[in-house]
């Protein structure tokens, strides 16, 4: 305990010593600062007294000079006397004996003024020269001063005269091809060219209307030959047996009993048949139906080949079309979006790839992605109506056809994936329209058209619900329907026989939006518009008879 107490007392003593030393150091610094401040104060006081003395001396000199100048300004001005002759001057010298004294005073005054001026500050001299006139004489001009700082830039001057044209420059690089301009004026007809080679044999045309009855011909000459009727001869021997006849149509199956075949009838269940306006078409339509119901089998699609991409555009919806009938017509037509009034016409495939086109203005707005081109005419759905428009290229007046009881409003699309109410199709058997009925609102129907009169020959009800369909196309008189994802063909219907047939094959692997799907009989390819990708699919047919359900 004693050692701990000693250690505590020692620590306390060292702390007190340190505090005392700090206080002493502060006191010393304070004293030194006080002495330094007093020294500075003394120096500043001496400088202030010197400045006050100098200022007082300047004031005294200034007041003395001002008094002298005031006295000088009150002195009378000396007027110069006219020159005198020598005799007068002599008399004046004799009569004015005291003049030399005044001359001496003037010299002394001048000397005093010079001495006074030499003691005057420059500022006072400047004030004196400015306030009085005649005392300060103007000296010679001084040397020129240094150049001043540059001034602000002036205003822009007016344009000068155009210079001479320079030499022609070097030829630049070839620029990008510009857009096609407006059509120019019609030029003069050129010279008649040589006759070209004969083209390929085209498809047979449609049967023309019967001609007018001709005039009665002239009466023929009287024949001089006399034909006598002979007696009836004996019966000849029997001939050899003839070749076997063609097989008859298949009979109906009656084993299943309850199930009825889905055959076509003229009643059009759930739909009103359109009767052609021309009475002569009734017999002709029956002939065509009987013709196409012949026992000859139509080829059926068995598979779809690998696709080839033609072009990529930015629009999700659209159609690209080629002429189906005329093989020599290489034009391509493109509609962008599922609604519009403009059509792009390309001269050929290279023009499509180079985006070189001509804009065509349609007479009515189109809707959907189910258009078709057939015999130089564009077939499309007139937006907001149940009307199909036939617009012949190069003509201004279109033709229209109404489909009664067809869905065309309230977004109850035939194919929701492509925003389409009507899908026009062209194949080897003619012109078709795929649509949905507004009576039941669920089944897919097909109307067969007479292309010559632009009228409906008959309506075919496939009884297949449109809710299960993604898109559809027609080839060789058979309707093919895809699933809702547009990846497989899951339904087929023979439109010529009015019966469903077995079909199930893959279409594509992509899950993109399939806005357009159309068969072209010209090259037997499927044309599609898939989320801006313009694609081509080769079609493979089978010649065997399709199995029916």
From Swiss-Prot:
Transmembrane annotation, as ranges: 18-38
PROSITE patterns for the chain: OLF
Keywords noted in UniProt: Cell membrane, Cell projection, Collagen, Developmental protein, Differentiation, Extracellular matrix, Glycoprotein, Membrane, Neurogenesis, Repeat, Secreted, Signal-anchor, Transmembrane, Transmembrane helix
Domain of life: Eukaryota
Tissue: Detected in Schwann cells (at protein level).
Residue ranges with Pro residues bias: 237-250
Composition skew (Polar residues), residue ranges: 260-269
Site (Cleavage): 94-95, 277-278
InterPro entries documented for this protein: Collagen, Olfac-like_dom, Olfactomedin-like_domain
Post-translational modification: N-glycosylated. Proteolytic processing by a furin-like protease causes shedding of the ectodomain. Further cleavage by BMP1 releases the olfactomedin-like domain.
Cellular component annotations (GO), alphabetically ordered: axon; cell surface; collagen trimer; extracellular space; plasma membrane
Region (Disordered): 74-107, 137-276
Cytoplasmic side: 1-17
Keyword Glycoprotein belongs to the record: yes
Role according to the record: Ligand for NRCAM and NFASC/neurofascin that plays a role in the formation and maintenance of the nodes of Ranvier on myelinated axons. Mediates interaction between Schwann cell microvilli and axons via its interactions with NRCAM and NFASC. Nodes of Ranvier contain clustered sodium channels that are crucial for the saltatory propagation of action potentials along myelinated axons. During development, nodes of Ranvier are formed by the fusion of two heminodes.
Description of its domains: The olfactomedin-like domain mediates NFASC/neurofascin and NRCAM binding.
Name of the protein in question: Gliomedin
Species whose genome carries this gene: Rattus norvegicus (Rat)
The encoding gene: Gldn
């Amino acid at each position: 305990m004693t050692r701990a107490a000693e250690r505590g007392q020692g620590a306390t003593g060292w702390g007190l010593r340190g505090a005392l030393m700090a206080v002493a150091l502060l006191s010393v610094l304070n004293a030194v600062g006080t002495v330094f401040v007093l020294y500075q104060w003394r120096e500043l006081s001496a400088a202030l007294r010197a400045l006050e003395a100098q200022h007082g001396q300047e004031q005294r000199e200034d007041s003395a000079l001002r008094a002298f100048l005031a006295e000088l300004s009150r002195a009378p001005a000396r007027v110069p006397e006219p020159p005198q002759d020598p005799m007068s001057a002599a008399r004046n010298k004799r009569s004015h004996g005291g003049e030399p004294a005044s001359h001496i005073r003037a010299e002394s005054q001048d000397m005093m003024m010079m001495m006074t001026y030499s003691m005057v500050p420059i500022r006072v001299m400047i004030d004196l020269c400015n306030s009085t006139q005649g005392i300060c004489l103007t000296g010679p001009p001084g040397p020129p001063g240094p150049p001043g700082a540059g001034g602000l830039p002036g205003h822009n001057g007016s344009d000068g005269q155009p210079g001479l044209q320079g030499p022609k420059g070097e030829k630049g690089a070839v620029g990008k091809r510009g857009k096609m301009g407006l059509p120019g004026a019609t030029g003069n007809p050129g010279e008649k060219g040589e006759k070209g080679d004969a083209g390929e044999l085209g498809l047979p045309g449609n049967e023309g209307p019967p001609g007018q009855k001709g005039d009665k011909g002239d009466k023929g000459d009287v024949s001089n030959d006399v034909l006598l009727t002979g007696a009836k001869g004996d019966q000849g021997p029997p001939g050899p047996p003839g070749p076997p006849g063609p097989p008859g149509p298949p009979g109906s199956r009656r084993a299943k009993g309850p199930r009825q075949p889905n055959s076509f009838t003229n009643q059009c269940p759930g739909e009103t048949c359109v009767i052609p306006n021309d009475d002569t078409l009734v017999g002709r339509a029956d002939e065509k139906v009987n013709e196409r119901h012949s026992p000859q089998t139509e080829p059926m699609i068995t598979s779809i080949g690998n696709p080839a991409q033609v072009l990529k555009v930015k629009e999700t919806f659209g159609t690209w079309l080629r002429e189906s009938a005329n093989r020599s017509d290489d034009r391509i037509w493109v509609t962008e979006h599922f609604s519009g009034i403009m059509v792009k016409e390309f001269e050929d495939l290279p023009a499509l790839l180079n985006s070189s086109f001509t804009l065509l203005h349609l007479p009515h707005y189109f809707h959907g992605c189910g258009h078709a081109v057939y015999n130089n005419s564009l077939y499309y759905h007139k937006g907001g109506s149940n009307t199909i428009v036939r617009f012949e290229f190069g003509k201004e007046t279109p033709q229209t056809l109404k489909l009664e009881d067809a869905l065309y409003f309230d977004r109850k699309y035939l194919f929701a994936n492509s925003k389409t109410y009507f899908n026009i199709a062209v194949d080897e058997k003619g012109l078709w329209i795929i649509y949905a009925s507004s009576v039941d609102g669920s089944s897919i129907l097909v109307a067969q058209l007479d292309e010559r009169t632009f009228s409906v020959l008959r309506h075919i009800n496939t009884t297949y619900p449109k809710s299960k369909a993604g898109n559809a196309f027609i080839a060789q008189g058979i309707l093919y329907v895809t699933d809702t994802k547009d990846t497989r063909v899951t339904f087929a219907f023979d439109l010529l026989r009015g019966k469903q047939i077995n079909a199930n094959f893959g279409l594509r692997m992509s899950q993109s939006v399939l806005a357009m799907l159309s068969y072209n009989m010209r090259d037997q390819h499927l044309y599609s518009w898939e989320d801006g990708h313009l694609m081509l699919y080769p079609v493979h047919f089978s010649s065997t008879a399709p199995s029916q359900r």
